[in-house]
Structures are given as structure tokens and as C-alpha cells.
């Protein structure tokens, strides 16, 4: 099957919080992009399927970019599937990332960067899936290699925190993702996800604030009888410990000048657990009760 499409995006933002606007006059910034995409899927035989495509992006601000994509799926039987993917990606900076200059009540600043360039990436993945009447499992390993990665970086100067957007020359993400859905009983379902990501440093500095480990789990119970439905969900989310570097300015008396320096932020891991119970009577009245962050 052959798929062709066109997508046009036109963003406009009117604000008094743009850079270079000391008088805080209302100004409008705009970005426009047009994308064309073409994709074809080919079923070679009952076990093999291949798809290939091309996406192009054009904007007056950043010019033309072409991005290929290819994917293959192998299904040795009805329960197993193996997938491999490659795609090239592209993202232009947003109006906020380019032009914003926002003061949050003197506590911190968000600063755009008009000199930023679009980020580009090459994405590779290999995954497997298994399913039967009650169980679905999937796992994926991936690598994402960026050039001119758009990143928000915390810096401190003028006695204030500043969140600034910038291009990183290169960044590499390696990750694993796993998903579980198990119908333990007809009325009881267990869901779970886990992700691991390793982000490269930028000249020895870890500016990315993503946690390496994250997981979610939920247990869903459903009960139904005439004119009544009960649904109870217990869910938990885990966010692992994360470390990243924040830029500061350090004054050196011997040199009588200040230099950029970094200090390490170390945020602990945490778990959030929620419980929600909903009851529906006669398909007309629904009562929901819930507790967020149960154990804290």
C-alpha cells in the first residue's frame, strides 16, 4: 500500500516576553513549515513485511531537509514478531526555544536562543514481541544519535537560575524498553513498563536531566453485573535517581575574573502509588473515589 501526505504547520505567538524587548511591548513571532511524506508497505510473504518512506521538511527559516525511513518485520509464527527500524529525524526549534525571554517572578529565567539550528538524528532499533490469549510481551533496544541536539541547560549567573536553550554538537542515547500486559484472570489485568536510557556527556558534562531508570505498573480489577459496574485500579510509578550538572560562575581572586564552573545535582529516586475506584449504576450514575500518593 502506498501512502502520500502533506502537512503544513503555522505557529504564531504574541507576547511581551520575547528577547530584545526591554519595553515589554506586544510582539508576534511566527514559524511556518511544510512537510511531504511518501511511504510504501510491501508484504513479501506471510512471514516478512518491509516498509520504506521519505519525509521532507521545508521552512523559510531553516531551508529543506529530507529524511528516509525503512522498517522490516519478521513473524515466524502467530505469536512471535521481530522488528528492525532505521529512520532519520529532524526537528526545528520552536518559537519558545528561539525567542522566549521569560522572568518567573525573579526566581528563574527561561531564555531562548535565536542562533539555534534544527536538530538531526539517526535512530536504530531492534525489538521482539510475544503474544497469546492472555499475555503480551515486548522488548526494544535502540540507539539515537543526534547532531545539534536542542537541549535546555540550567545555568546560574547574576544570582539567578537561568534555563537556556542551546545546540549540543553531538549527543547519543542508548536505551531499552519493555512492556508487559497479562490478563491474570478475566477480571484482573497486570500492566507494566520499564525503560532504561544512557545519555552521553557533552565534553564531560551531563546536561541531560533524564533519569536512567523509569518504570510503571498497574493492577486493574473489573466486576460487572446487571445495572452495576466496578473498576478498581492500583498504579505505581518509579523514577530512578538522576545526576546532572548545572553551570555556575566562580570568581577567582588571583585572576580577578570569573569562570564557568559546574556543580552536580543529585536527585533521589522515588515511587508514587495511586488508587482509584469507580462504580457505575444503571449506566447513568458514576461514582469515583481515589487517593494519590498513598504512602506519603
Residue ranges and their predicted role:
Residues 207-296:
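Conserved C-terminal beta-signal and adjacent last beta-strands/turns
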Residues 1-62, 75, 130, 135-142, ...:
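Face-selective signature of the C-terminal outer-membrane beta-barrel domain
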Residues 14-22, 62-68, 96-101, 108-109, ...:
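Outer-membrane beta-barrel translocator domains and adjoining extracellular loop/strand segments
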Residues 43-47, 142-145, 165-246:
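Gram-negative outer-membrane beta-barrel transporters
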Residues 2, 47-50, 79-82, 134-137, ...:
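Repeated loop/turn-to-beta-strand initiation elements of outer-membrane beta-barrel proteins
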Residues 4-10, 52-56, 70, 84-88, ...:
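Transmembrane beta-barrel strands of outer-membrane/channel proteins
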Residues 75, 81, 88-146, 156-183, ...:
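Outer-membrane beta-barrel signature, preferentially recognizing the C-terminal barrel domain
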Residues 1, 38-40, 70-74, 126-130, ...:
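Residues on the lipid-exposed face of transmembrane beta-strands in outer-membrane beta-barrel proteins
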Amino acid at each position: 500500500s502506498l501512502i502520500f501526505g502533506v502537512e503544513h504547520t503555522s505557529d504564531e505567538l504574541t507576547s511581551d516576553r520575547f528577547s530584545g524587548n526591554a519595553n515589554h511591548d506586544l510582539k508576534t513571532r511566527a514559524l511556518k513549515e511544510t512537510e511531504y511524506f511518501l511511504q510504501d508497505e510491501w508484504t513479501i510473504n506471510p512471514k516478512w513485511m518491509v516498509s520504506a518512506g521519505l519525509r521532507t521538511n521545508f521552512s523559510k527559516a531553516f531551508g529543506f531537509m529530507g529524511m528516509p525511513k525503512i522498517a522490516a518485520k519478521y513473524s515466524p509464527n502467530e505469536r512471535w514478531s521481530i522488528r528492525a527500524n532505521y529512520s532519520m529525524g529532524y526537528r526545528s526549534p520552536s518559537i519558545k526555544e528561539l525567542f522566549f525571554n521569560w522572568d518567573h517572578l525573579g526566581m528563574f529565567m527561561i531564555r531562548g536562543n535565536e542562533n539555534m539550528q534544527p536538530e538531526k538524528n539517526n535512530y536504530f532499533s531492534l525489538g521482539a514481541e510475544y503474544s497469546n490469549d492472555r499475555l503480551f510481551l515486548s522488548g526494544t533496544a535502540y540507539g539515537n544519535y543526534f547532531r545539534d541536539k536542542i537541549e535546555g541547560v540550567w545555568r546560574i549567573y547574576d544570582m539567578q537560575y537561568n534555563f537556556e536553550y542551546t545546540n549540543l554538537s553531538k549527543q547519543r542515547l542508548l536505551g531499552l524498553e519493555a512492556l508487559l500486559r497479562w490478563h491474570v484472570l478475566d477480571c484482573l489485568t497486570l500492566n507494566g513498563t520499564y525503560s532504561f536510557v544512557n545519555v552521553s556527556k557533552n565534553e564531560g558534562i551531563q546536561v541531560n536531566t533524564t533519569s536512567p531508570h523509569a518504570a510503571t505498573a498497574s493492577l486493574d480489577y473489573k466486576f460487572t453485573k446487571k445495572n452495576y459496574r466496578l473498576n478498581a485500579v492500583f498504579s505505581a510509578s518509579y523514577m530512578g535517581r538522576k545526576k546532572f550538572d548545572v553551570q555556575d560562575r566562580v570568581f577567582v581572586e588571583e585572576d580577578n575574573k570569573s569562570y564557568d564552573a559546574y556543580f552536580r545535582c543529585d536527585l533521589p529516586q522515588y515511587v508514587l502509588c495511586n488508587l482509584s475506584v469507580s462504580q457505575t449504576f444503571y449506566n447513568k450514575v458514576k461514582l469515583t473515589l481515589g487517593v494519590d500518593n498513598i504512602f506519603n
